[in-house]
């Protein structure tokens, strides 16, 4: 299966994430706490917690911080109880946006999210207005040059759903959300190291933006991601910023 080029967008996204690394620990602690509260403290039986722990390890979070977050989630330590919220809306050129939050104050969060949309040329929509365009899935990206046939065989054997070759030569392995960590581990054991990967909400129909529109859309995404209560921002926009 062929796909269009995502390599430049992936590299740009990683650069933005690195620039915001100071907020990553806070978001990971929230996610670990909620995952442990919802599914228990055993990552072997809790795919959401397993994914959060993978991200914590990738970002070199101290083990004491991780364990404390798990203990707060399971009730072994007292902690804040976070509410999960999802907001939907539209950005530049009608591009769809989904914003996932963890908060202890719903009133504050919706006001902050609405302000970020309004100030940056977007519109906060109603529940379900864009969700139909997104699918929940995991992905792993491998650099151009990896043998596609061998990677495909290893990935499908590990439980992947699909393998996509992009126009730029990078290869993307698609998984079910709960299978992502297992497929990643199996491929690493087989010698395949991904350069990017996550469990995400992926748009089925994308909106290409370039020039000023792309810059404005990036500003809107950044404003949302900068909010303390926001965990993840998903969009149908493909930004051509060069």
UniProtKB/Swiss-Prot annotation:
Q: Which UniProt key words apply to this protein? A: Cytoplasm, DNA-binding, Transcription, Transcription regulation
Respond yes or no to whether keyword Transmembrane helix is given for this record. Answer: no
The record lists the membrane-crossing segments as none
UniProt key word DNA-binding = yes
Molecular function terms in GO for this entry?
DNA binding
One BP annotation, GO: regulation of DNA-templated transcription
Q: Which GO terms describe its cellular component?
A: cytosol
Q: Where in the cell is it found?
A: Cytoplasm
Q: Which HAMAP family match?
A: Transcrip_reg_TACO1 (MF_00693)
User: What family does this belong to?
Assistant: Belongs to the TACO1 family.
PANTHER family, A to Z: TRANSCRIPTIONAL REGULATORY PROTEIN YEBC-RELATED, TRANSLATIONAL ACTIVATOR OF CYTOCHROME C OXIDASE 1
Q: What is the protein's name according to its record?
A: Probable transcriptional regulatory protein NGO_1291
Species of origin reads: Neisseria gonorrhoeae (strain ATCC 700825 / FA 1090)
């Amino acid at each position: 299966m062929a796909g269009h080029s995502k390599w430049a967008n992936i590299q740009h996204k990683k650069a933005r994430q690195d620039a915001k690394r100071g907020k990553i620990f806070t978001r990971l602690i929230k996610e670990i706490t909620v995952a442990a509260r919802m599914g228990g403290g055993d990552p072997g039986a809790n795919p959401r917690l397993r994914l959060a722990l993978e991200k914590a390890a990738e970002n070199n979070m101290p083990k004491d911080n991780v364990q404390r977050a798990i203990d707060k989630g399971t009730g072994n330590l007292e902690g804040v109880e976070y509410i999960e919220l999802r907001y939907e809306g539209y950005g530049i050129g009608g591009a769809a946006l989904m914003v996932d939050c963890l908060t202890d104050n719903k009133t504050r969060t919706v006001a902050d999210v609405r302000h970020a949309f309004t100030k940056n040329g977007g519109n906060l929509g109603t529940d379900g207005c864009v969700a139909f365009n997104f699918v929940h899935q995991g992905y792993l990206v491998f650099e151009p040059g990896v043998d596609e046939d061998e990677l495909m065989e290893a990935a499908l054997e590990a439980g992947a759903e699909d393998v996509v070759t992009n126009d730029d030569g990078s290869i993307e392995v698609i998984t079910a959300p709960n299978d992502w960590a297992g497929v990643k581990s199996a491929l690493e054991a087989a010698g395949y190291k991904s350069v990017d990967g996550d469990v995400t909400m992926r748009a089925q129909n994308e909106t290409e933006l370039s020039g000023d529109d792309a810059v404005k859309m990036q500003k809107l995404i950044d404003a949302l991601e900068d909010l303390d209560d926001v965990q993840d921002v998903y969009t149908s926009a493909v930004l051509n910023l060069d």
